[in-house]
């Protein structure tokens, strides 16, 4: 295969992770299908496909664990202010400063994680377009 076509295909495998914004788990399914389709054409495409799929599985796992970490705090902060809910028949939505700062912290951490994921996919796509073998940071090797 020509090097230019190989680089373009590697670029497309990396950029296909943005399908996760269109449908659930698209960031895993789309690169997996692209990698399975193109992996026999060259060693470079095989390596980059594995790298993309491993990163997106790891990234999805990290986001899931982050969500699980914050759910108890979110539920606890809502019900802490509403401990007398069963006696008063109204729900108090006055969160106060502690909950506002908690919400701002949650939004900040979530934004950083999502923007980091987007930036890493863009960087990897551009490196693959140049023919470089890019390795994502913090990636668990599910597929070896």
Where are these regions (language model features)?
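Hydrophobic alpha-helical transmembrane segments in multi-pass membrane proteins
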Residues: 11-28, 54-84, 98-121
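Repeat-unit-sized solenoid/scaffold elements
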Residues: 94-111, 131-144
């Amino acid at each position: 295969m020509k090097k230019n076509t190989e680089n373009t295909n590697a670029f497309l495998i990396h950029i296909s992770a943005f399908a996760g914004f269109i449908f659930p788990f698209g960031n895993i399914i789309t690169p997996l299908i692209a990698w399975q389709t193109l992996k026999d054409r060259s060693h470079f495409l095989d390596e980059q496909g594995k790298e993309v799929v491993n990163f997106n599985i790891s990234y999805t796992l990290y986001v899931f664990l982050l969500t699980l970490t914050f759910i108890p705090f979110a539920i606890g902060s809502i019900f802490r202010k509403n401990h007398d809910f069963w006696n008063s028949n109204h729900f108090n939505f006055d969160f106060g400063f502690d909950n506002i700062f908690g919400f701002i912290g949650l939004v900040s951490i979530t934004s950083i994680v999502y923007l980091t994921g987007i930036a890493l996919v863009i960087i990897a796509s551009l490196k693959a377009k140049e023919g470089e073998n890019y390795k994502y940071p913090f990636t668990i090797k599910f597929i070896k």
